[in-house]
Amino acid sequence: MKNNEYKYGGVLMTKPYYNKNKMILVHSDTFKFLSKMKPESMDMIFADPPYFLSNGGISNSGGQVVSVDKGDWDKISSFEEKHEFNRKWIRLAKEVLKPNGTVWISGSLHNIYSVGMALEQEGFKILNNITWQKTNPAPNLSCRYFTHSTETILWARKNDKKARHYYNYDLMKELNDGKQMKDVWTGSLTKKVEKWAGKHPTQKPEYLLERIILASTKEGDYILDPFVGSGTTGVVAKRLGRRFIGIDAEKEYLKIARKRLEAENETN
């Protein structure tokens, strides 16, 4: 092993951006890092990949008209390029996922259909099509179509008859007043109190990741987020006693994620 390489749970990596209490952040191109990871080493993957919305449009934020351009990482020139991007990272993610592991992928109408197709093309079986119904979506400024108030989260496992994915049915039922948990989840956008460490354009609320992690992992499991952004997956993973690796190519977002993980380490 070279001087600048580390081992984490059997996963070979270069020196991490952050490494404390089994919480790892890596500054890297996702494709490059995934290709170096140990095969079948992760119990669960949560991904919120680029939505490819940055096309010069406008949206609403706090009553103000704002650009939807999020950065070069969210721009793409064609559907073919978008779909190849999704197929490539999903193919690499499959290699590092354990035989009984699962992957969750969040998206909007702008990319989720490509994601769903890519999952099936790369040998996954989709288990659920979760609809996240937002109680306080941004208003529709154009008034030319229905207000976008939902996002989709696909849950999938490898398309292998021998695969036995984990689902904590009893806990989900308990959290839903003794009734079976349905595939429509209702809740607010990310609260301001969760955005204290800095701004990220697509930060997910902690309650969403809490349900996902509790439903599909056990304490001590390895969770990977290949587009970690502001670090919500890692924060909730730490809180729930899971081990975590997060990857991002943008240092400005890793700084936010590190602040949040440091705060979580101090309190838990």
From Swiss-Prot:
UniProt keyword list: DNA-binding, Methyltransferase, Restriction system, S-adenosyl-L-methionine, Transferase
- Which Gene3D superfamilies does the UniProt entry name for this protein? Vaccinia Virus protein VP39
Q: Identify the EC number(s).
A: 2.1.1.72
Coiled-coil parts of chain: none
Q: Does the keyword Transcription apply?
A: no
Q: Which domain of life is it from?
A: Bacteria
Q: Does the keyword Aminoacyl-tRNA synthetase apply?
A: no
Any one GO MF term held by the record is: DNA binding
Q: Which InterPro entries match?
A: DNA_methylase_N4/N6, DNA_methylase_N6_adenine_CS, RM_Methyltransferase, SAM-dependent_MTases_sf
List this protein's GO terms for biological process.
DNA restriction-modification system; methylation
Give the reaction(s) catalysed. a 2'-deoxyadenosine in DNA + S-adenosyl-L-methionine = an N(6)-methyl-2'-deoxyadenosine in DNA + S-adenosyl-L-homocysteine + H(+)
Q: Which GO terms describe its cellular component?
A: cytoplasm
What Pfam families does this protein map onto?
N6_N4_Mtase
Q: How does it assemble?
A: Homodimer.
By sequence similarity, the record places it as follows:
Belongs to the N(4)/N(6)-methyltransferase family.
Function of the protein: Further methylates DNA that is already methylated at 5'-GATC-3' sites. Essential for establishment of a previously unmethylated plasmid transformed into the cell as single-stranded DNA, enhances plasmid transfer to DpnII-containing strains of Streptococcus pneumoniae.
Q: What else is known?
A: The DpnII restriction system has two different methylases.
Which protein is depicted?
A: Type II methyltransferase M2.DpnII
Q: Specify the species.
A: Streptococcus pneumoniae
